[in-house]
Amino acid sequence: GYVNNRRSNLPYGETDGTWKSHGGFSKVGTCSLPGYSGKVFEPNDEYKGDFARIYFYMATCYEDKIASWSSDMLSHNSYPAYKQWVIDMLLRWAKNDPVSKKEIDRNNAVQRVQGNRNPFVDYPGLEQYIWGNKTDVAFSYDNYDSTIPDPTPDPKPDPNPDPNPDPTPDPNPDPTPTPEPSEGEQVYTLVA
């Protein structure tokens, strides 16, 4: 829509904003972070963590290609892939905007269609083991330290849980229908 049009292909960043969306939730302006002084797009706080986790996932999925991409956010190498000001910003965004139900639902829908998942949604804080303050700690499920509080314990836990339970089938396995394309729009089909 309109806000995405205003973003154009600007890098994400933080700004006081010379342009602000209705309500001031998203902004465009000169970057206020040390390390970059160009024009940036700052998304609504509600979505900053979403973008951070998407960008972390993109860097891991396309590690063999990202060095050749062009963006003011990128360091033109496969690791760390992003410039330090971007890493610091994305780590902060991921911490300050925890994984939401909307992200979990999107991750589940993507898995149904594409067969893959974003591990940064499934394991909040995983980015700390790759770019943050836990890079000297080998990630494993045993030492994984989630930034999300544990859910309320089951008042009647199963005394003999199945170590390999079958996943619960999705009650609504059909993906959301897609609207018909407008004239001139291209249609792409995802192949699993």
Report residues per predicted region.
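Asp/Glu-rich intrinsically disordered low-complexity tracts
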Residues: 150, 154, 158, 162, ...
